[in-house]
């Protein structure tokens, strides 16, 4: 059950924490399972984190998509509490609403698919008529993210870290962007999301 959400913003660091109420269940750890295959033959694996108290988070490298967040109710019955699709094909063909994805380089739409920065106008790839939505047709939500399962922390936290490099000119945006997103489940039944990026030079994000 979602109790509250806290959001803290720092320069180039964003951390969101969701606090959930649950009961103790299986051992903490990370399980990797096949989720599907892309047209180019790449296998897509799903990483499922469990904090040992019943909170489970599943994520895939395509778009950094969170496919499920399962937690038990007061009677111990587990349920997925985030919107998700049924299969990899659904995410590839029907995810027009960007369900579960990491949005970038820019969230929301840029009217006309252009913007001016430091006196220079940048023309962007468009994917909503004349507009650029959520980073364009090749935005972060459709990209392949690396996923590293991190060792179990001394405090019992379970985490994975996703990484992506967006080169200068990607979708028309200036500057090279190195971004990482860490998903952590804690023994306090929190799902923590940490965003970090390195900007060379500082582009629009």
Annotate each language-model stretch with its function.
Residues 19-205:
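Surface-exposed acidic/polar loop and edge beta-strand patches at domain peripheries
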């Amino acid at each position: 059950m979602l109790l509250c959400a806290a959001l803290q913003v720092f320069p180039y660091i964003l951390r969101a924490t969701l606090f959930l109420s649950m009961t103790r269940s299986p051992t903490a750890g990370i399980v990797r399972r096949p989720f599907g295959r892309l047209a180019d033959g790449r296998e897509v694996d799903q990483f499922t984190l469990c904090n040992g108290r019943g909170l489970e988070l599943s994520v895939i490298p395509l778009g950094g998509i969170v496919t499920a967040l399962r937690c038990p109710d007061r009677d111990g019955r587990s349920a997925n509490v985030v919107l998700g699709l049924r299969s990899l094909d659904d995410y590839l063909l029907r995810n027009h609403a960007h369900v579960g994805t990491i949005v970038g380089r820019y969230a929301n739409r840029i009217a006309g698919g252009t913007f001016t920065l430091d006196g220079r106008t940048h023309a962007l790839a468009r994917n909503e008529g004349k507009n650029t939505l959520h980073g364009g047709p090749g935005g972060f939500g459709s990209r392949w993210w690396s996923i590293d399962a991190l060792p179990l922390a001394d405090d019992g936290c379970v985490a994975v870290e996703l990484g992506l490099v967006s080169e200068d000119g990607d979708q028309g945006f200036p500057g090279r962007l190195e971004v990482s997103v860490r998903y952590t489940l804690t023994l306090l039944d929190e799902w923590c999301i940490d965003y970090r990026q390195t900007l060379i030079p500082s582009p629009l994000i």
